[in-house]
């Protein structure tokens, strides 16, 4: 009941309460270089990342699948991975530079519930790039499993009104 009272008058443009900064979460993530480039813009978080690695595979863009070019895409990835291995033996620090935006890295991300609201508002919105949107939706789903009331109104800007109607039908 407390969270319903706290969120009763919230609007899509409102910041959530600062008290939610006391609720921390830690996520172990694997993501593409493209996704990481967007995620690291969220400064109210701690990100600890490993190097990109062919051993983590790649993220296949839906646009490549939509035009039926997965085979060609993966052939280029195979060539890239071969170049990576050649360079890695001579200059390990230079090898990651040959990898693509589709290659993945592991990331530990620590953030608080208030920042997760902010991340969800921007990155789970239908206008967000598909890769960061998918990652953000998975993070939000996992966090909601643990604290459903705390994150009851966390969603993309485009989904706020529908979510509000679910929890506050008379408002």
List the predicted regions and their residue ranges.
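A conserved ligand/cofactor-binding region detector
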Residues: 1-171
């Amino acid at each position: 009941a407390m969270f319903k009272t706290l969120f009763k008058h919230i609007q899509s443009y409102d910041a959530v309460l600062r008290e939610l900064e006391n609720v921390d979460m830690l996520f172990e993530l694997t993501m593409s270089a493209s996704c990481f480039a967007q995620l690291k813009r969220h400064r109210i978080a701690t990100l600890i990342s490993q190097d990109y690695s062919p051993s983590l595979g790649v993220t296949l863009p839906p646009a490549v699948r939509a035009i039926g070019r997965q085979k060609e895409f993966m052939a280029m990835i195979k060539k890239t991975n071969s170049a990576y291995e050649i360079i890695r033996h001579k200059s390990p620090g230079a090898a990651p530079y040959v990898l693509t935006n589709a290659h993945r890295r592991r990331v530990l991300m620590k953030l608080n519930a208030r920042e997760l609201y902010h991340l969800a508002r921007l990155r789970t919105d239908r206008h967000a790039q598909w890769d960061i949107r998918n990652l953000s939706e998975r993070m939000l789903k996992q966090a909601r499993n643990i604290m459903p009331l705390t994150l009851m109104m966390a969603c993309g800007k485009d989904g706020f009104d529908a979510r509000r109607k679910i929890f506050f039908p008379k408002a």
